[in-house]
Amino acid sequence: MAVKIKLTRLGKIRNPQYRIVVADSRTRRNGRAIETIGKYHPKEEPSLIEVDSERAQYWLGVGAQPTEPVEAILKITGDWQKFKGLPGAEGTLRVKEAKPTKLELFQAALAQAENEPVGEAITPKKKKAKAEDAEAAADAPAEAAAESEAADK
């Protein structure tokens, strides 16, 4: 039985996600697999590539042939160079930067809060603005009445 290491497609229409599987060469793309040895998510930045190196080396050693895309992935992870005995076995896999922890984010927010100036509010309070509007409204009818009396004379 000829065995291939190939990709099976998962995911949504515009968000492909693949599993790296070992399967009989005669099975269809998403057909029955002998073993799953990794996963590949090309839409993430950088692309998520996880390969069980030990199992990949085993299957390559017993004669499984990788497809072209899987061979490229194995070259990135360094498994292909390790199998062939070539230099540069560390590969060119880019690793995603670690997200800051909640504690680090909290400490940064505290430091930023301490650096802010401590003074009075710049904007006026709403109560004063309402009181001024009420005074202006009370003055307006009195002025209008005074003008109408002056016009009558």
From Swiss-Prot:
**Keyword Ribonucleoprotein in annotation:** yes
Q: Name one GO molecular function term.
A: structural constituent of ribosome
The answer on whether this UniProt entry bears the keyword ATP-binding reads no
Which Pfam families does the record match to this protein?
Ribosomal_S16 (PF00886)
- The protein depicted here goes by the name Small ribosomal subunit protein bS16
Give the record's family classification: Belongs to the bacterial ribosomal protein bS16 family.
Give the InterPro entries listed for this entry. Ribosomal_bS16, Ribosomal_bS16_CS, Ribosomal_bS16_dom_sf
What GO terms describe the biological role, i.e. biological process, of this protein?
translation
PANTHER family assigned to the protein according to its UniProt record, in alphabetical order: 30S RIBOSOMAL PROTEIN S16, SMALL RIBOSOMAL SUBUNIT PROTEIN BS16M
